[in-house]
Amino acid sequence: MSKTISLLKFIICILISLCSFTYAEKIRDLTSIEGIRDNQLIGYGLIVGLDGTGDQSTQTPFTNQSLHNMLSQLGVTIPPDTNMHLKNVAAVIVTANLPPFSHTGEAIDVVVSSMGDAKSLKGGTLLMTPLRGADNQIYAIAQGNILVSEKNNLKKNNSIFSNQVNSGRINHGATIEREINTDFGKKKIINLQLNKEDFGIAQKISDMINVQYPDTATALNSKTVQLNTYANNTIQVHMLSNIQNIDISMPSQEAKVIINPRTGSIVINQEVKLGTCIVSHGDLSILIEKKEEEKINSFLFETLRKNQKESFLKNIINRNYINNNSVKNTSLNNIVRVLNSLGTKPNELISILQLMKNAGCLHAKLEIV
């Protein structure tokens, strides 16, 4: 009997936690440490060994020029008037990210992208390419065989898509030759930068840190929490390892609807609320109303001819309409689902949402990307 009661208590606790409107995230998922970041590297190089899919020399003269320079550095002399027609060489841009606290000799991944009119980089080998930082210093050397996705034609919605074969990757293709010096552990001040500005979350982070480390954290603004610690590597590492694992209870998210007009994609979060309004668009009319007697939201959706709109709107004003199509769960998701089921085009759907926002019944931030 006691085991059954304990099991019921456990299930109730789980249900309560699932029904909660708040959730917790660790500080490491909400912030980054100022000054500790990746550094971008870039270089120009040549790929050889292509199966006739390289640059056309007449269209990309810089490929031949680069090949001449490389061969001369290797001690190979080519007459200046020689016009080489090579189809197995391509000029490329090589990019990589140098992680923080990287050491000499470590390997990092690189991305290789064609500069000219090469048809494919498949089967090619990148020759030794220096990678430079923003200060024009060489931080890594890249070389190796390129991994390119297989070219498959995919048919979707009567359109044919092909995998990109003019770029590829080299896993562990660059070796770090120079380290980036940081001032970590040399200053008493550490700034935590929030991934998304929010005064409430910044203050919560500061308060929770001060519980574990009193008088340490201060919320400077909606984006920065400042830590006052000791200028010592060991102390700061130990302190940050503990701070980053502190749980922060998160408030409700900002109500937001994100729309991509090019693809017709719509993303809606659970905080979006609807108010009472009427939206008329083309042959579609939407009534969204809160029914006080049932203490719930419901909406009536009807498709009308143009000559029926006037009588429909009059009936709505006088509350003399038939509520046989009402849906009790008045979420924006349901309205979008019903509109989609009736064959509403994406641009019409986006226009309706914008009208609902303008009418004041869509209580959310409408973001068009």
From Swiss-Prot:
What are the subcellular locations of this protein?
A: Bacterial flagellum basal body
- Gene Ontology process terms (BP): bacterial-type flagellum-dependent cell motility
Q: Name one GO molecular function term.
A: structural molecule activity
Q: How does it assemble?
A: The basal body constitutes a major portion of the flagellar organelle and consists of four rings (L,P,S, and M) mounted on a central rod.
Tell me, in a sentence or two, what this protein's role is.
Assembles around the rod to form the L-ring and probably protects the motor/basal body from shearing forces during rotation.
Family as reported in the entry's similarity comment:
Belongs to the FlgI family.
Q: Can you name this protein?
A: Flagellar P-ring protein
Q: What species does this protein belong to? A: Buchnera aphidicola subsp. Schizaphis graminum (strain Sg)
Q: What is the lineage of its organism?
A: Bacteria, Pseudomonadati, Pseudomonadota, Gammaproteobacteria, Enterobacterales
Q: Which gene encodes it?
A: flgI
